[in-house]
Amino acid sequence: MDEIINKYQAVEKLFKEIQEGLAAYDQYKTLISELLHYNNHIKQEYFNFLMIISPYLIRAHSGETLRNKVNNEIKRLILVENINTKISKTLVSVNFLLQKKLSADGMKTKNMWCTNNPMLQVRTAHNLFKQLCDTQSKTQWVQTLKYKECKYCHTDMVFNTTQFGLQCPNCGCIQELMGTIFDETHFYNHDGQKAKSGIFNPNRHYRFWIEHILGRNSEQELGTKQDPCGTKVLQQLKKIIKRDNKCIALLTVENIRKMLKEINRTDLNNCVSLILRKLTGVGPPQISESILLRGEYIFTEAIKIREKVCKKGRINRNYYPYYIYKIFDAILPPNDTTNRRILQYIHLQGNDTLANNDSEWESICMELPEIKWKPTDRTHCVHFF
């Protein structure tokens, strides 16, 4: 957390140095205005980050026992929210802006960016501007900021209220308008329709399914108004097990799903892991928080890539347990038999659907360096009880 705060403060200080260094030169007024946009943006990101972690900081000071838990939660937020990536993207944009202006002013920039550190690249560009300013005389002409002109193809941009900014009709580039409020009509009910959130959050789906796959969901989900604790359901399942002479220790996810279908309780398919734990006394593995966080990050990236590469015309909804299965199958070592038991608690769909999912997953893996593609192997049902 301290590292992120220091990074935000260092970026703000660097932006301030650049603006102060160019303020005396009239020919750079347009550039300063453009840099101000990124300066405001990084300040807003810094403020948002502090707002996110502030409740956890308050909890951390309330007791020693909560401190480790709070620190882990803040680390998870930093990873999931891609804080480092957001800072780097802003620095890359600023570096591109400076490099473009330097090239326009006749300064050779080729081969000057030999580092992958965006912070160092921006500082290098700043130093080059100092050299350029020393060799040029101050001029008094004034430029006007053409904020509606696309910086890539110089086409007039149009307002796009869904993206909260200007969009180029030619290349599709979007320029965010900081501090501008649009009519948010999509947040109001029309003709009795239910208002929906316009923000898709893959992390919420990941946490929901991980909670259910690991059997950490509430036991009240098994119940009804007449049977709050789900005792009746468990009794019905035990009768079927006894009738069919099934070995409780060898029960699988597919066994439980078939029995739930028989008693017309397929609404409990999401609770199979919890039911298995109640019946067998053996639950899913308790995977460490670091592995779960890594899985959450890869899951988020995979869903984003899927939205870009998904096959046209395919209307099937995302089956998120499949993604979780593929991720943990890839990141858990083959000899880690304890944690790999999680694969036994994930239901895989039919062969045709699985083949389609594997084909789509192969396309995702091409843009996901963390995962190496391989076809799904159904022989994971080897028991380690």
Swiss-Prot record:
One of its GO terms (molecular function) is zinc ion binding. A zinc finger (C2H2-type) spans 166-190. The keyword Nucleotide-binding does not apply. It comes from the Viruses. Signal peptide: none annotated. One of its GO terms (biological process) is regulation of viral transcription. Transmembrane segments: none annotated. Keywords: Late protein, Metal-binding, Zinc, Zinc-finger. Induction: Expressed in the late phase of the viral replicative cycle. InterPro entries: Poxvirus_VLTF3, VLTF-3_Zn_ribbon. The keyword Repeat does not apply. Belongs to the asfivirus B385R family. This is Zinc finger protein B385R.
